[in-house]
Each structure stands twice: as C-alpha cells, then as structure tokens.
Amino acid sequence: VLIEPINSEAKKLENKKFIINKGLWSSKTKKRLYILDNRLGSSSMYEPNNINFDLHNIKEKKYSDYKVTRSIEVECDTLSSQLESINIRHLDYLKIDTQGAELEVLKGLGNYRPIFIKVEVHFFSMYRNVPSWHKLINHLYELNYVLIDWKTIGSHSTRIPAETDMIFIPNFNNEIGEELIKKNKKKFISLMLIFGQLKL
C-alpha cells in the first residue's frame, strides 16, 4: 500500500496494487501540503525552516531546492480508516517518512499493530513547528513498541545525526508484545533478516 496525496504523482503509481490518494493525519481533516517541486520527496505538511538547514549540512547554494514552489489543500484521513476502506485487516510492516508528520500518522494507527515499524525521525527538524522527536518515541512506547536500531540519514554537521531512520518492534519484555511476535513468528524473523537485525 502506497500513500501519495499529490494527484499527479499518484497517477504515476496507478499500476501498483493499492494507492491511497490522500494525506494521512491523526483525524479526518484538510491540511495544506507545501510542495517542493525541485525536491518532491521533501514536500511536507510543515513549511521548511532554513534556520536548521546548516545542521543538515545543506549549503546555501542548495537552499533553492528546499523552496516551497506551491501549496495545495489535501484531504487527510487516518491510516486505520484508509486501510479498512481497502479491506486490509492486518499490517505487518509500516514505513513512515512524511517530513515531520510521522507522529500524526502514528496517532491514526487505530488497532493496527505492525510487527516492524521503520520511521524517519528528525532530531533537528528542517520544518517549522514539528513536534519534538521524543514525543514520537514516547507515543510508540505507549503503543507497546521498543526502539531496537537507528541508522543515520544523509549528511549532518552535528555530533549526533540531524535525522535517522529508527526501527521499532513490539515490546518483547511483556506478554502482549511477546504474543504479537509469536503469532507472526515467520514474518517477524523475515523482516528482521531483511533489515539486518538478525544474522543466520
């Protein structure tokens, strides 16, 4: 299942099995999407914040790549609602890279409990008014997930990375998390192997 709120980009993906042509948020709403046509993958529900560009090692000559070229209003819904609408009852793997909206997406997870979650986390956000990274991690802990790994993304000029991909799995230290893993043992092992968390 792919999520793509920009109509022109969603049309390019029409040959895929499931495309959700909406934005994801913590509730059904309308949000403004700030589009960076020079760097579409960096489009966001939040406006870029060039004060932090230096921390991401973005040179001034590249600032134009991160300039908002247009903005559109997009229909947003929760992830759980959209998955139910296409009759997907179970989610094994969830990857979230939404340039700041990761926490809002996770708040819309409903009763879905993936066995493997990969989420982009900014320690120093490139966007204005993005919730602090620790709120995202705390939310996942409240959903009974634990952080097992992170990998630095891109370049940065700080001693700790400006942004990372973090991997979360069900909390194996309690009965609920352990049971979720056991029920999906083969899938869990496969995902752990694919993402280099286990060695044969």
Q: What do the predicted segments below correspond to?
A:
Residues 1-200:
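Phosphate/nucleotide-binding beta-alpha loop and adjacent structural elements of enzyme active sites
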